[in-house]
């Protein structure tokens, strides 16, 4: 996926979220369930088998994966009727810019000589950073971190957070936040 496409997609999802979603009143203590939306068929939760869907104490926090903007808008309208919190409710435009600017900050990362079993892997690390693989996941991970940080700044206590903890950039943002 081209860098420009990833950046544009993140901007557009943020703006669609602001346009189509209702800011919900959130309790001061909440439970969050991290979910990935891969289609606009929202009647079947492929991760938790709808276990949390009707639980009033749990809020789903969706991340959109490989959806067209039309399908994202359709999902956003549906979320207004359910226990969903959108990250955009707690992220500012400045937060989105900061997460997207990661694309350019990565070039400024300085790597010291790094050895693994007497082999210098500095060039390998620099190459991986330069290729920007998983750029979208890195941006979403930063947004997840900022989302959690902003919840704390609004004095919202997280009683529990369920995420897949697959050690991906997306989950690391959740866990660090």
Where are these regions (language model features)?
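Catalytic-core helical/loop segments in enzymes performing group transfer/polymerization on anionic/lipid-linked
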Residues: 1-177
């Amino acid at each position: 996926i081209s860098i420009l496409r990833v950046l544009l997609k993140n901007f557009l999802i943020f703006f669609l979220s602001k346009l189509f979603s209702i800011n919900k009143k959130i309790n001061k203590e909440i439970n969050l369930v991290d979910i990935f939306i891969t289609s606009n068929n929202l009647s079947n939760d492929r991760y938790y088998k709808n276990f949390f869907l009707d639980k009033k104490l749990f809020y789903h926090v969706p991340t959109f994966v490989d959806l067209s903007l039309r399908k994202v808008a359709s999902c956003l309208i549906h979320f207004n009727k359910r226990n969903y919190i959108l990250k955009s409710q707690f992220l500012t435009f400045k937060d989105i810019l900061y997460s997207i600017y990661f694309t350019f900050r990565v070039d400024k990362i300085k790597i010291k000589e790094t050895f693994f079993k007497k082999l210098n892997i500095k060039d390998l690390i620099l190459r991986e950073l330069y290729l920007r693989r998983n750029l979208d996941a890195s941006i979403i991970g930063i947004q997840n971190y900022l989302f959690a940080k902003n919840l704390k700044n609004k004095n919202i206590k997280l009683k529990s957070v369920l995420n897949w903890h697959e050690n991906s950039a997306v989950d690391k943002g959740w866990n660090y936040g």
